[in-house]
A protein has these predicted regions:
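N-terminal amphipathic/basic-hydrophobic helices that include classical n-h-c signal peptides
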Residues: 1-17
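Membrane-embedded alpha-helical segments of multi-pass membrane proteins
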Residues: 86-93, 166-173, 216-217
C-alpha cells in the first residue's frame, strides 16, 4: 500500500508540473458563475448541502429505531488496524481526483460530480427512510499509533447511517472517473485506481466501520 501510494503521489506530481490548468480560476467572480467558463462550479454547491443533511441525520434528527446491519460473513472477517491507512486515504483519493478533474478535465469533473450527487443523494434518502446502524466495533486494545488513530475515528464517527457506504461509493466514483480520463486509461493506471478502490472498500469491513451488506449496497 505504501509503495502504491508513493507511486500515485509521484505520478500526480509529474502531471501537475507538466500540465497547465484549463481554466484560470483567478479570474472567477460570483457574477461570472453562470458563464460557460465557470458554471460547472455550481456542482460544488452539493457538498455543503450534503454535509448539512448528513449532519442533521447524524446528530439532530428525532430519536428513531436504527436497524442493525449484519450478516454471517461479518463475523468471519477479523478486525485489522492496518486498514485504517487506506480508510483515511479515502479523503485524499476522492479530493485529489476532484481537484485534478476540476483543473484539467472539466467534462470528467462534471460526470464525476453528477455520479456523486445521484449516489450520495440516494444514500441520504436511504438513511432518512431506513435508519440503520452497525454494532460490529470491537474493544480496542493497545496504545500503538494505528490503534489510537482508530479510536479517534470511532469517537468522531457514529455507528449510524452506514448502509450504503459513502466510502465505497466515493472510491468507485474515483475509479470510474479515472477510466473516463485518457491519461489514466493505461492498464497500470486503471489497475492502480481499482486496487485502491478495492482496498478502501475492504478497509470499511476490516475496521468494523461497515457490514458486508453496506459494501454490497
Amino acid at each position: 500500500f505504501i509503495l502504491l501510494t508513493r507511486r500515485v503521489f509521484s505520478a500526480a506530481e509529474r502531471i501537475l508540473i507538466m500540465k497547465l490548468p484549463l481554466i484560470d480560476y483567478r479570474q472567477f467572480r460570483l457574477s461570472r458563475l453562470n458563464t460557460p467558463q465557470f458554471r460547472h462550479l455550481k456542482l460544488l454547491l452539493f457538498w455543503p448541502i450534503f454535509s448539512l443533511v448528513f449532519c442533521y441525520l447524524e446528530n439532530y434528527r428525532p430519536t428513531v429505531y436504527y436497524a442493525p446491519m449484519r450478516c454471517a460473513l461479518d463475523h468471519w472477517i477479523p478486525f485489522c488496524k492496518w486498514f485504517v491507512i487506506p480508510y483515511a486515504f479515502w479523503f485524499l483519493f476522492v479530493g485529489g481526483m476532484l481537484l485534478y478533474t476540476l483543473f484539467y478535465n472539466i467534462p470528467a469533473f462534471r460526470r464525476m460530480m453528477w455520479f456523486i450527487i445521484l449516489t450520495y443523494s440516494f444514500a441520504l434518502v436511504t438513511y432518512l427512510l431506513f435508519p440503520n446502524c452497525q454494532h460490529l466495533r470491537p474493544t480496542l486494545l493497545g496504545g500503538d499509533l494505528l490503534t489510537r488513530f482508530t479510536a479517534k475515528l470511532y469517537a468522531a464517527d457514529t455507528n449510524t447511517n452506514v448502509c450504503p457506504s459513502i466510502h465505497v461509493i466515493g472510491s468507485f466514483a474515483v475509479y470510474f472517473a479515472a477510466r473516463d480520463i485518457r491519461r489514466f486509461r493505461a492498464k497500470g493506471w486503471r489497475l492502480g485506481f481499482l486496487t485502491m478502490a478495492v482496498l478502501i472498500s475492504l478497509s470499511t469491513v476490516f475496521l468494523k466501520q461497515h457490514s458486508v451488506l453496506d459494501v454490497l449496497a
